[in-house]
C-alpha cells in the first residue's frame, strides 16, 4: 500500500510538470508570452534540469526582447542538454546573444 501511495504521488508530481509545460506551449502558440513564462516557472520548480524547459524559456525571453534573460536560459539549456541538436541550437543562440 505504501508503494502504491508513492507511485501515485510521483505520478501527480510529474503530471503537474507536464501539464504546466503543455499550458506554456499553448500560451506561447497563442502569443501570450508573459503567461507562458508563468507556466514555465511552475514547470521549472518540479524539474530544474530539463533542458526543454530552459529552451522554451529562452525563446520566450527572446520574443519579449529580453536578451539577458534569454542568454541565461540558453546557458542552462546547454548545461543540462545531452542532445547534440539541442546543444548546437543553444550554442548558436548564446553566440548570437553575446554579440548584442
Where are these regions (language model features)?
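Canonical tetratricopeptide repeat
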Residues: 56, 89-93
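Alpha-helical tetratricopeptide repeat
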Residues: 17-28, 55
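Register position in tetratricopeptide repeats
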Residues: 29-30, 63, 93-100
